[in-house]
Amino acid sequence: MASLKEVKTRINSVKSTRKITSAMKMVASAKLHKAQGAIENMLPYERKLNKILTNFLSADLPVESPYIKAREVKRVAIVAFSSNTSLCGAFNANVIKMLLQTVGEFRTLGQDNILIFPVGKKVDEAVKRLGFEPQETSPTLSDKPSYQEASELAHRLMEMYVSGEIDRVELIYHHFKSMGVQILLRETYLPIDLTRVVDEEEKQKEEEVQGGEIANDYIIEPSAEELIANLIPTVLSQKLFTAAVDSNASEHAARTLAMQVATDNANELIQDLTKQYNKSRQQAITNELLDIVGGSMQ
């Protein structure tokens, strides 16, 4: 049995750890609240963009764009979102696992034809361990997502796709649903699937109270071609920003939950060690009393 001093030292050590995990939980919770605010502010804009595109497509107007043309995949780009720091449960491990599966599916293309854009230090480190050369991305897009940085990466991917440098772009990120639920997603970013955008908008319409419907016989100025040329890149930039914000909120939610579990475990361990300390102390006192009584009887 451990000595009283050893048990006391362990109790103090666990209490110190509990202070750290409790503080990290509060910090992560505050950051999560901020990230949720960013999502709430972003959603109306995203829905409006999708609604404009949906209304445009429902008018049966011709849609021509280099971003919707699918072709044989000879070179692929993968954009994976992780965190810059650890202590967030299985958040990063799940992203890396999904990345490994995705890379495995495209192995036949050859390593030189798989371009990985890591957003976050943890996935960047994993890419290097896999033997790939990570493509450069913004170092702050993971922990402080901004539309400007997301738009720059989106336009870079669009330029590579239009030029034929890559034939497909996939995203791997966590979608934030709630404090306890973050869904790992793998989605095709390019070529853009306009029918999916329409389906998402239709689902949103079903959840809303139906008002007056807008007629589909649009008069478009200056032209439908120019509208599409500007609208689809905007939708793609917004999509990448949405993934970054979703991933950021999911990270903080995962860290808040992980630190809560760590704090609860520390509390349980302190209780067990305190019981052990009291039991050892009681045993020591009993032994001393027996020694005193035994000595007086001699």
UniProtKB/Swiss-Prot annotation:
Annotated Gene Ontology cellular components are: plasma membrane; proton-transporting ATP synthase complex
Coiled-coil stretches are none
- In terms of superkingdom, the source organism counts as Bacteria
Compartments where found? Cell inner membrane
Q: Name one GO molecular function term.
A: ATP binding
UniProt xrefs under SUPFAM superfamilies: ATP synthase (F1-ATPase), gamma subunit
Going by the UniProt record, its keywords in alphabetical order are:
ATP synthesis, Cell inner membrane, Cell membrane, CF(1), Hydrogen ion transport, Ion transport, Membrane, Transport
GO BP terms: namely: proton motive force-driven ATP synthesis; proton motive force-driven plasma membrane ATP synthesis
Record-linked Pfam families: ATP-synt
**What transmembrane ranges does the database entry give?**
none
Q: How does it sit in the membrane?
A: Peripheral membrane protein
Cytoplasm: is it a keyword of this entry?
no
Signal peptide coordinates:
none
* InterPro entries the UniProt entry points to: ATP_synth_F1_ATPase_gsu, ATP_synth_F1_gsu
- Cystine bridges: which residues? none
Subunit composition and interactions: F-type ATPases have 2 components, CF(1) - the catalytic core - and CF(0) - the membrane proton channel. CF(1) has five subunits: alpha(3), beta(3), gamma(1), delta(1), epsilon(1). CF(0) has three main subunits: a, b and c.
* Functional description taken from the UniProt entry: Produces ATP from ADP in the presence of a proton gradient across the membrane. The gamma chain is believed to be important in regulating ATPase activity and the flow of protons through the CF(0) complex.
Q: Which HAMAP family match?
A: ATP_synth_gamma_bact
What family classification does the UniProt entry report for this protein? Belongs to the ATPase gamma chain family.
* Protein name in UniProt: ATP synthase gamma chain
Question: In which organism is this protein found?
Answer: Bacteroides thetaiotaomicron (strain ATCC 29148 / DSM 2079 / JCM 5827 / CCUG 10774 / NCTC 10582 / VPI-5482 / E50)
The organism's lineage? Bacteria, Pseudomonadati, Bacteroidota, Bacteroidia, Bacteroidales
Name of the coding gene: atpG
